[in-house]
Amino acid sequence: MATIEGTFVNSSSLRVAIVIARFNDLITNKLLSGCMDCLSRHGIDVSESSNQLDIAWVPGSFELPIISQKLARNGNYDVVITLGAVIRGDTPHFDVVVSEASKGIATVSRETGVPIIFGVLTTDTMQQALERAGIKNNLGWSYALQALEMGSLMKAVN
């Protein structure tokens, strides 16, 4: 029986795209910072001149799937990380955005065969979002680790 796992040992050959929502950018910028820190510490060049990392900005979390799909289909990336923050309000808009973003991101991953990391915070309050984006810990770091593991695992499986 073979055990196949992704590793974090040598991530320097991975090409990563990050698709990030501008809406709630107080939160998404913090997630991006945590993500970039993790990628950098694991051998990904995050400099402005990097050929390993590209970042695409979209208006909100609802738009994450379409740009993730475009990037995944072009064959330039081993993994795509999506970053967004949807905070519950007084209307059902939250439920629609979260549902469509999550289904869309999962569909893109299945249809393209490229791991798409779901890095969208879904919280009831701004305080909860802030706690997940840096006050207590930064889930951007975790999303980057997931990306590195999945990128490595996909190479191991192929």
From Swiss-Prot:
It catalyses: (2S)-2-hydroxy-3-oxobutyl phosphate + 5-amino-6-(D-ribitylamino)uracil = 6,7-dimethyl-8-(1-D-ribityl)lumazine + phosphate + 2 H2O + H(+). The keyword Transferase applies. GO terms for molecular function: 6,7-dimethyl-8-ribityllumazine synthase activity. The active site is at 93 (proton donor). 5-amino-6-(D-ribitylamino)uracil binds at residues 23, 61-63, 85-87, 118. One of its GO terms (biological process) is riboflavin biosynthetic process. Its EC number is 2.5.1.78. Pathway: Cofactor biosynthesis; riboflavin biosynthesis; riboflavin from 2-hydroxy-3-oxobutyl phosphate and 5-amino-6-(D-ribitylamino)uracil: step 1/2. Pfam families: DMRL_synthase. InterPro entries: LS (IPR034964), LS/RS (IPR002180), LS/RS_sf (IPR036467). GO terms for cellular component: cytosol; riboflavin synthase complex. (2S)-2-hydroxy-3-oxobutyl phosphate binds at residues 90-91, 132. Keywords: Riboflavin biosynthesis, Transferase. The keyword Signal does not apply. Catalyzes the formation of 6,7-dimethyl-8-ribityllumazine by condensation of 5-amino-6-(D-ribitylamino)uracil with 3,4-dihydroxy-2-butanone 4-phosphate. This is the penultimate step in the biosynthesis of riboflavin. Belongs to the DMRL synthase family. This is 6,7-dimethyl-8-ribityllumazine synthase. It comes from Prochlorococcus marinus (strain NATL2A).
